[in-house]
Amino acid sequence: MSMPATSTKTTKLATSLIDEYALLGWRAMLTEVNLSPKPGLVDRINCGAHKDMALEDFHRSALAIQGWLPRFIEFGACSAEMAPEAVLNGLRPIGMACEGDMFRATAGVNTHKGSIFSLGLLCAAIGRLLQLNQPVTPTTVCSTAASFCRGLTDRELRTNNARLTAGQRLYQQLGLTGARGEAEAGYPLVINHALPHYLTLLDQGLDPELALLDTLLLLMATNGDTNVASRGGEGGLRWLQREAQTLLQKGGIRTPADLDYLRQFDRECIERNLSPGGSADLLILTWFLAQI
């Protein structure tokens, strides 16, 4: 992907700045997948509750997606004068092209579809804020992303069509809004819970990997994860939330010895075929936002 040396034709953003944020997005995806052990998720130890994907698929996928993150930022900047509700339609073709490269990189395996949506939104929000000379903070980025998604849940989940998507079915049956609802609300699970929790643990001197694992537990305990519900129904989701909450109440992940609890949790998730992929996507955003 070729870009001008200093700025794009239609924006005033320096290529170096665009690439800096794109690199953070790539690092966020790698940080999440390499984090181990993660209950039910692909990591350096095993493939979790997945039989169709491995660690290397995620590495290839993240690299393919990194090449598209500057496009999201650029579009966010180019569309800065548009009404925010109009931005999402312009982002969709970029997201679909990015998704195509992901599938080509992984031979058809869906590794990061959720992250394309969420990181794409945040990158576009960053581009818009930079173009408008507004502060780029976790709060402003998430509120800007939310403005792009206004009405999204109504449009895409509240439908009476005979052929429901998995997301529409989970919304009708359990009231779960998934990635769309979290985005439209401005990522409250990240902004109000995961990010301050993670930053507090780092400020206390906790090892960054342990802090991130503990933050993953917090997300698993609070997130209405549609990935989990689609595999295990409401019962599977409630079980996973209870188990994560129990570990947090016992003190969470504070020492390497606590990793044994996560390994046992991982084994139980694999037995139940549960994978908290939605929480993993939110963890990617948490790490990403912690860097800006």
From Swiss-Prot:
EC numbers on record: 2.4.2.52
Record's keyword annotation contains ATP-binding: yes
MF terms in GO: ATP binding; triphosphoribosyl-dephospho-CoA synthase activity
Top-level EC class as recorded in UniProt: transferase
Biological processes annotated in GO: prosthetic group biosynthetic process
Domain of life: Bacteria
Catalytic activity, as annotated: 3'-dephospho-CoA + ATP = 2'-(5''-triphospho-alpha-D-ribosyl)-3'-dephospho-CoA + adenine
Protein name as catalogued: 2-(5''-triphosphoribosyl)-3'-dephosphocoenzyme-A synthase
Species this protein is from: Escherichia coli O6:K15:H31 (strain 536 / UPEC)
